[in-house]
A protein has these predicted regions:
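A conserved FAD-binding loop/helix module that cradles the flavin
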Residues: 353-374
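A glycine-rich dinucleotide-binding beta-alpha-beta segment and adjacent secondary-structure elements
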Residues: 54-67, 219-238, 242-243, 255, ...
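Non-transmembrane alpha-helical segments in soluble domains
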Residues: 42, 104-105, 278, 282-285, ...
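FAD cofactor-binding and catalytic pocket of flavoenzymes
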Residues: 1, 119-259, 268, 313-316, ...
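Conserved redox-cofactor binding core of oxidoreductases
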Residues: 1-65, 71, 302
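Patatin-like phospholipase A catalytic core
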Residues: 1-29, 191-216, 222-226, 275-277, ...
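Glycine-rich loop(s) and the adjacent beta-strand/alpha-helix scaffold that form part
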Residues: 62-65, 74-152, 347, 366, ...
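Beta-sheet entry/capping signal
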Residues: 50-53, 74, 83-92, 125, ...
């Protein structure tokens, strides 16, 4: 069921396309301004009586008792080689999905497999959000889509604005047996270049690299017999699979910590999702008379192959995933590492699955939830 807030937002946009509710729904992305945590919260952190911030203190080891049921200390090290040991009653590791994994695996003094890795699940089920170009829309009226779906940025906000797009309904996911997805319709590169050049000229600023930009635009446009108005970019959920994982290498970094190797692997369900989602979008665009979707050849192949241009959006997910038992994951429902009384993980590494949207909002929500849980436990003790 759609959030009533977004339903209300849609009511003010009377020109949204009337997708069949069993097929697609309109999506809305809002992009916040970049947040530099240290700059924004420095004064608050400095004045807090509950928080001590240590600079240049990189955690390089989690030490447990011999039975691996309790963390006894953390070892920290600076780039200059200074070391110290931190003791606490509870420990929360919140260094991002990749670093969370590296730290657990590298802390292998007691157990060669690392901390919290009794069942070998640390680093497994590494997920991202596959971003793929699925095709072009052929339309006799490209402006109709441009008016609806181009990304817009408020004046002076640079890249921070919003974009409209389409996404899966629960009904179509069940019907087609696919994961979640969303897609946005973006102008062809040539049109983007020409718009930038024209805006610069209107402002009496001769465009930089004029000849090369013009050449790129012309090459993109020449030979287009029909109106290829927009490229369609899809962002999908990735199915958790243990063949996609993070592992340590023999190489060391400046802190003498082992570097990691990312084995990001997509599977047949991921590819099936892209194919079926593309077909649904094409069917709906055709039914509404907006245009025809020219689907890329690779999308229609019944295999698990993705093009080399596929990327994950820098959304690292699932490497210390939440589970009911240690056999299926690394942390429990309270983000506590299975079998270790005082060790918790925060961040998108605990996500069992990642959906199709950026993870930051959920990361913050889970971090606040974890903070409340730990605070309640501290008060009780």
């Amino acid at each position: 069921m759609q959030n009533p807030i977004f339903t209300a937002a849609e009511s003010g946009l009377d020109n949204l396309l009337d997708y069949l509710p069993s097929k697609l729904e309109s999506m809305f992305w809002s992009f916040s301004t970049p947040t530099r945590f240290g700059q924004k919260y420095r004064a608050e952190l400095e004045s807090s009586s509950d928080v001590t911030v240590l600079m240049h203190a990189n955690v390089v080891d989690i030490t447990t008792n011999p039975s691996e049921t309790k963390v006894t200390s953390l070892k920290i090290r600076s780039l200059s080689g200074n070391e110290a040991v931190i003791n606490a009653s509870r420990y929360i590791i919140a260094t991002g999905a990749l670093e969370n994994t590296r730290l657990l695996l590298a802390s292998n003094t007691i157990n060669p497999a690392g901390v919290g890795n009794h069942s070998g699940m640390v680093g497994k089920n590494y997920q991202n959000h596959p971003h793929v170009d699925i095709g072009n829309i052929v339309s006799s009226d490209p402006q109709a889509l441009s008016a609806l779906y181009e990304r817009r940025a408020p004046s002076g906000q640079g890249d921070n604005g919003f974009r409209l797009g389409v996404g899966a309904t629960a009904a179509v996911q069940e019907e087609r047996e696919i994961l979640n997805f969303s897609a946005s319709f973006q102008e062809e590169e040539a049109k983007k270049i020409l718009k930038v050049m024209w805006n610069e000229i209107k402002s009496f600023n001769w465009p930089t690299d004029f000849s090369s930009k013009l050449k790129m635009a012309v090459e993109d446009l020449v030979g287009q017999e029909k109106r290829l108005s927009h490229q369609v970019y899809m962002y999908t959920e990735q199915a958790p699979n243990e063949d996609s994982y993070i592992a340590l290498t023999d190489q060391k970094d400046a802190l003498d910590m082992p570097r990691i190797n990312m084995h990001w692997k997509l599977n047949a369900l991921d590819k099936h999702t892209v194919k079926q989602a593309s077909l649904v979008i094409g069917e709906e665009l055709g039914r509404l008379g907006v245009g025809r979707l020219n689907i890329r050849d690779w999308v229609m192949q019944d295999d698990a192959k993705f093009p080399s241009s596929t990327w994950g959006g820098c959304h690292q997910i699932g490497t210390t995933r939440m589970s009911e038992s240690a056999e299926d994951g690394v942390v429990d429902g309270n983000c506590q590492v299975h079998g270790i009384d005082n060790l918790y993980m925060a961040g998108s590494s605990v996500f069992p699955t990642g959906g199709h949207t950026p993870p930051t909002f959920t990361i913050v929500a889970l971090a606040l939830r974890l903070a409340d849980h730990v605070a309640a436990g501290s008060s009780a003790s």
